[in-house]
């Protein structure tokens, strides 16, 4: 499913720093979605 942009805007400040330190599918997905904002 698609996560609404409003949710990404809320969670990116929290999860993006984590994602940048990690690798793997989930971290890559987070970095890609947060990068679109």
Curated annotation (Swiss-Prot):
GO terms for cellular component: extracellular region; membrane; other organism cell membrane. Its main location: secreted. Expressed by the venom gland. Pfam families: Ectatomin (PF06457). Disulfide bonds join 12-34. Keywords: Calcium channel impairing toxin, Disulfide bond, Ion channel, Ion channel impairing toxin, Ion transport, Membrane, Secreted, Target cell membrane, Target membrane, Toxin, Transport, Voltage-gated calcium channel impairing toxin. It is found in: Secreted; Target cell membrane. GO terms for molecular function: calcium channel regulator activity; monoatomic ion channel activity; toxin activity. It comes from the Eukaryota. Heterodimer of an A and a B chain; disulfide-linked. Belongs to the ectatomin family. Ectatomin-Et subfamily. Algogenic for animals, human and insects. At high concentrations (0.5-1 uM), it acts as a pore-forming protein that forms nonselective cation channels both in cell and artificial membranes. It is weakly selective for cation over anions channel conductance is identical in both directions. At lower concentrations (1-10 nM), this heterodimer inhibits cardiac L-type calcium currents in isolated rat cardiac ventricular myocytes. This is Omega/M-ectatotoxin-Et1a subunit A. The lineage of its organism: Eukaryota, Metazoa, Ecdysozoa, Arthropoda, Hexapoda.
């Amino acid at each position: 499913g698609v996560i609404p942009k409003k949710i990404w805007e809320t969670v990116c400040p929290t999860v993006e720093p984590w994602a940048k330190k990690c690798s793997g599918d989930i971290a890559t997905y987070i970095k890609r979605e947060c990068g679109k904002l």
